[in-house]
Amino acid sequence: MLGDRAIAAGAEIRLGVVAHAIEDDGAGVTVRLSDGSEDRFDIVIGADGIYSDTRQRIMPEAGTPEYTGQAVWRYNLPRPDDLDALHAFNGPTGVGLVPMSSQMMYMFVTTPEPGNPRYDKAGIARAMREKLSGTAPQIRELAKGITDDEGVVYRPLETMLLYGAWSRGRVVLLGDAVHATTPHLGQGAGMAIEDSIVLAEELARADTPEDAFAAYRERRFERCRYIVESSLAICHGQIGKSPPVDNHAATTQMFEVCAQPI
């Protein structure tokens, strides 16, 4: 839907290419792409995720994402008839059941993973089932359906937050490129969408891109910091790195914070 709306608004979407060079001369930005083409723009927005190449190009001093010590496993399963909302099971191995349609749900499982191990794709379904061996009986029963290695999505949880500037010259960062959060409060995509709204507003009213970028960062930093740090506190509490956090209370507070104007 977002892609269709962008095209309808006049955007040109090019797939299968990446920026090989970003050169800001103060009057505009020249971008050379991996297919050999080159174009010039008024500004560049790096919305390219936690491993942002744009961030590395304009702020090599920004560092890299930090591994939290926890990972998440995901798998789609048939939805039980009585599952009509998110069901969460807390503990060192956390489990969530999330309805997706009248027929399907997905299960997510958070586990402590010291040392950031890697799991081979062959046998990863068995590994996920084994992670659930000490959970509640109903979860162990559902785990019997985790059989397809290709269906398992495993991700180490990493985080980062730029406490300084979010832009350099005519190039600005957005979303996970500047404030990557763990999923414990479910606000990663929401923060990126809010970023885009605020950035558009500030570009429309500012005299220069630099002024717009500074105002955008000023409006966004505290809320994004709150989400990143609060999510990480839940994560660390679950794996014993810090005191446990009351997930229900943290989620209630998050809804109150995110209901405020941006």
Q: Locations of the language-model features?
A:
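Conserved mid-domain beta->alpha element of the FAD-binding
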Residues: 45-46, 128, 151-237
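Conserved, helical-rich catalytic subdomain that frames metal- and/or nucleotide-binding sites
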Residues: 144-147
